């Protein structure tokens, strides 16, 4: 295989967006809605969303208040929380994990999580008012 064989895509991003890249150890064990909730809780815990919710966050980021130093310190914690949740779910025999749901759709009897290794790379898009968001 060559690098030119790879699939690529592009997505428009904005300051304040969270990008999560991970192995199947995360996505087989943690539902996308739960990943979103965890990311939102992380934003609230570290003060990226306060006093007005997401609208206030977007206004603050648009005005150039990116909190980039705090983000650099806090973003590893989000990856850690997600990995921990994946491990917890992988060991839960009663959970209908994303893997279990897909298995059942394909007539494979599976319940619980899917024991697997997990790697998560979490990124927080930051910059100042004059930065391009491309």
State where each predicted segment sits:
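C-terminal catalytic subdomain
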Residues: 2-22, 26-134
């Amino acid at each position: 295989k060559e690098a030119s064989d790879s699939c690529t895509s592009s997505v428009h991003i904005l300051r304040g967006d969270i990008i999560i890249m991970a192995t199947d150890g995360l996505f087989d064990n943690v539902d996308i809605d739960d990943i979103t909730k965890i990311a939102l809780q992380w934003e609230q815990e570290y003060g990226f969303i306060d006093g007005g919710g997401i609208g206030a966050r977007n206004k603050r980021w648009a005005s150039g208040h990116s909190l980039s130093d705090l983000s650099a310190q806090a973003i590893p914690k989000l990856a850690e929380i997600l990995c921990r949740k994946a491990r917890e779910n992988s060991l839960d025999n009663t959970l209908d994990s994303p893997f279990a749901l897909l298995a059942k759709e394909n007539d494979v009897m599976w319940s619980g999580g899917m024991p697997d290794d997990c790697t998560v790379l979490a990124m927080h898009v930051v910059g100042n008012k004059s930065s391009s968001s491309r």
